[in-house]
């Protein structure tokens, strides 16, 4: 409890954590919890089972609770934006004179719009009528923006009418929809100075202190109106300085900061906000935190963690809701109407509720994307961008949206690209590093070569049912076509899977198949062997886990496998991602994954907690034709066996190439074993019993200590000598002075 409390975790959560036997935080928790509690965006990567869920759930629960507590007690917090006339007494950007997607920070100076298709603008709370004035704008990112001056009559789209004058990052000045080249381009980290001489009717700009020359001369009718600092943004962030802080590049020639304008020359904005107060009341269907998971199982797992962590939180109690498909939406809507604080869900149902207005995102403080690489792999990039654009970047109480991204690896280009788009200067917490295979995992490859192993010809019809990719092809022995070899590979892989189970007397394993139909076919083949879901204790007892199974069935199947009621879990990558399954002694890859990172995810499920594990991958020597659905139905009812480039839904799958990429990625050569799948005794580890701890673990460590012992003794002697010399030097000055 003390260990978590030292990180700033509230006692109620620390007590719940202690009851879960979490005496010390894991590495990812120790790094991430303080960062999130401190208000930052965090990108975290660590192995599955390392405590990532706790690393984001604990601080999210605490901050949501503190926010609700403050609201209940009537506190507005240090960062609350003032309303009504109070806003107009300060030089800042006006929250009541801005576009719908334009966010203003608690200081009134930091501004942001994350709308990527439309421009959204804003004006300052006060304008000037006489004199020479200056303000600065700092660019915080690489988005598009225009800054300058406008009257109260001007459009918020600065520079598109005769009442506004703007200077844009593309090096163009704009007035009345006329865009002319001026100065030079500017972008992130640049500071733009905006000069206004009302008496002469002149406007000019500077970049990082460099005067860019006269930009506009405005007509007399403009001089009779108050001019306000203004900007317009598209997916950009700026910070204004009206002179209350020291300017980076102080103006010369008699220009002064706007905040020093004499009262007689200052006019307050007509937009006072008296009828437009930013909504602060709590809506029942507006949660404070949204956690997005790639699968139902992972969402349920995360929700259970949230329930455990909030166990002792009271006054106010936190209300959580699981939003997933396959469950009656009516039940979820009734809970939403009663009020929720934390929502955990999967993209499909979340998208439905958000698009219909049933789930309101206006008060979200936290957006958590768990297993982000999995979400992107499933094609949810547009969904993520869509919901992010609907969440205010700064809430009504002045707090900034925090985005937390968890991924099995941060070395994915897509994850990096996403973080640059939706996160605000995120801190990277990468405790995983480059992919590597744990020492407790033996992984081997079995080459499936139908040209040398003719077993498939002798089986007749007594083989695994295949995926019907070759339903219209001639695959009979003797055809000698790529289609025949492909069908033979599918048959042999079913036989090799059964052979591996018998050879190693597997009592528990995860079997990864590439598609949902492959999973179903493997389950059916195990039933033909006398096993299946209802044969508890049988050598081939199994359950199936993939997206087409009903949620309740998936949940029950997972629990049955965890309890040991069945020996084998047959699943796809997507269904198994992030599921908390420990200590499985065997994994069989019926087909290599097309993403090399997924190979490490799969085999990383064995050999945990110092227990040895064996991962067997069946790799086709020839190319295999497989389903690759690009149709709108995502494979349901699709039998288009033409290749993708011909408008169909199949591809030729080259596992030998994938194997090469995996070996290059891991910087190692994976051992190959014969089709009899007998794994030779390792010269280093000796005879290994998979699922049990390494017999030589302690001995190896002891040997390592013996090797280091002489060096450590030498180091101790040197340390003693250094300390003694230091003590002698301490007395030396006094002795020297005595001699004189």
From Swiss-Prot:
Task: Outline the segment boundaries, as ranges, of region: Interaction with dsRNA.
Answer: 1-448
The main enzyme category here is hydrolase
Entries under Pfam families matching the protein = DEAD, Helicase_C, SPRY
**Binding-site list for ATP:** 46-53
List localization entries: Nucleus; Cytoplasm; Cytoplasmic granule; Cytoplasm, Cytosol
The listed location of motif DEAD box is 370-373
What EC identifiers does the entry list?
Answer: 3.6.4.13
Q: Which residues form the B30.2/SPRY domain?
A: 70-247
What range(s) does the Helicase ATP-binding domain occupy?
2-428
Q: Supply the alphabetized keyword list.
A: Activator, ATP-binding, Cytoplasm, DNA-binding, Exonuclease, Helicase, Hydrolase, Mitochondrion, mRNA processing, Nuclease, Nucleotide-binding, Nucleus, RNA-binding, Transcription, Transcription regulation, tRNA processing
Full protein name:
ATP-dependent RNA helicase DDX1
| Protein's organism | Gallus gallus
């Amino acid at each position: 409890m003390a260990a978590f409390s030292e990180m700033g975790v509230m006692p109620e959560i620390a007590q719940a954590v202690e009851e879960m036997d979490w005496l010390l935080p894991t590495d990812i928790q120790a790094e991430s919890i303080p960062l999130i509690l401190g208000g930052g965006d965090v990108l975290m990567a660590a192995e599955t089972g390392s405590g990532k869920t706790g690393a984001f759930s604990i601080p999210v629960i605490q901050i949501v609770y503190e926010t609700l507590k403050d609201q209940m007690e009537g506190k507005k917090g240090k960062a609350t934006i003032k309303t009504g006339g109070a806003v107009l007494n300060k030089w800042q950007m006006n929250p009541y004179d801005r576009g719908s997607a334009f966010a203003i920070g608690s200081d009134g100076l930091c501004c942001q719009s994350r709308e990527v298709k439309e421009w959204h603008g804003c004006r300052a709370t006060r304008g000037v009528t006489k004199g020479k004035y200056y303000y600065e704008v700092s660019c915080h990112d690489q988005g598009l923006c225009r800054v300058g001056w406008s009257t109260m009559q001007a459009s918020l789209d600065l520079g598109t009418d005769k009442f506004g004058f703007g200077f844009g990052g593309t090096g163009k000045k704009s007035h009345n929809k006329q865009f002319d080249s001026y100065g030079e381009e500017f972008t992130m980290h640049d500071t733009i100075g905006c000069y206004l001489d009302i008496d002469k009717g002149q406007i000019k700009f500077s970049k990082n202190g460099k005067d860019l020359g006269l930009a506009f001369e405005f007509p007399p009718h403009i001089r009779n109106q108050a001019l306000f600092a203004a900007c317009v943004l598209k997916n950009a962030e700026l910070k204004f300085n009206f002179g209350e802080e020291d300017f980076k590049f102080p103006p010369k020639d008699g220009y002064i900061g706007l905040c020093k304008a004499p009262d007689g020359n200052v006019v307050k904005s007509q937009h006072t906000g008296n009828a437009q107060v930013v909504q602060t009341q709590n809506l029942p269907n507006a949660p404070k935190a949204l956690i997005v998971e790639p699968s139902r199982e992972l969402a349920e797992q995360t929700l259970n963690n949230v329930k455990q962590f909030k166990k002792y939180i009271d006054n106010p109690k936190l209300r959580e809701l699981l939003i997933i498909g396959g469950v009656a939406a009516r039940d979820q809507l009734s809970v939403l109407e009663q009020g929720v604080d934390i929502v955990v869900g999967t993209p499909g149902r979340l998208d439905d509720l958000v698009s219909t207005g049933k789930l309101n995102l206006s008060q979200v403080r936290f957006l958590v994307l768990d297993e982000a690489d999995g979400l992107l792999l499933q094609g949810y990039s547009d969904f993520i961008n869509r919901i992010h654009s609907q969440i205010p970047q700064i809430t009504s109480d002045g707090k900034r949206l925090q985005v937390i991204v968890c991924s099995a690896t941060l070395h994915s280009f897509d994850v990096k690209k996403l973080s640059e788009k939706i996160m605000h200067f995120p801190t990277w917490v990468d405790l995983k590093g480059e992919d590597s295979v744990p020492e407790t995992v033996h992984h081997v490859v079995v080459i499936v070569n139908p040209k040398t192993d003719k077993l498939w010809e002798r089986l007749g019809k007594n083989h695994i049912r295949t995926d019907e990719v070759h339903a219209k092809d001639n695959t009979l022995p003797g055809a000698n076509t790529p289609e025949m070899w492909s069908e033979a590979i599918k048959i042999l892989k079913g036989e090799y899977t059964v052979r591996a189970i018998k050879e190693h007397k597997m009592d528990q394993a995860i079997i990864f198949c590439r598609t949902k139909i492959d999973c179903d076919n493997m389950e059916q083949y195990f039933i033909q062997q006398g096993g299946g879901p209802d044969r508890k204790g049988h050598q081939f007892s199994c359950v199936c886990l993939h997206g087409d199974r009903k949620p309740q069935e998936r949940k029950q199947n997972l629990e049955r496998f965890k309890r040991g009621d069945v020996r084998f879990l047959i699943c796809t990558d997507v269904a198994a991602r992030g599921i908390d399954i420990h200590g499985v002694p065997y994994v069989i890859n019926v087909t290599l994954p097309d993403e090399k990172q997924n190979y490490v995810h799969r085999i990383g499920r064995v050999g945990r907690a110092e227990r040895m594990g064996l991962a067997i991958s069946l790799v086709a020597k020839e190319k295999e034709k497989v389903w690759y659905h690009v149709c709108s139905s995502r494979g349901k009812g699709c039998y288009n066996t033409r290749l993708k480039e011909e408008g169909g839904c199949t591809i030729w799958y080259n596992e030998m190439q994938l194997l090469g990429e995996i070996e290059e990625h891991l910087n190692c050569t994976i051992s190959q074993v014969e089709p009899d799948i007998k794994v030779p005794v390792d010269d280093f580890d000796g005879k290994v019993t998979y699922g049990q701890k390494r017999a030589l673990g302690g001995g190896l460590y002891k040997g390592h200590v013996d090797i280091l012992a002489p060096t450590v003794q030498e180091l101790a002697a040197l340390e003693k000598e250094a300390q003694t010399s230091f003590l002698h030097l301490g007395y030396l000055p006094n002795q020297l002075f005595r001699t004189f």
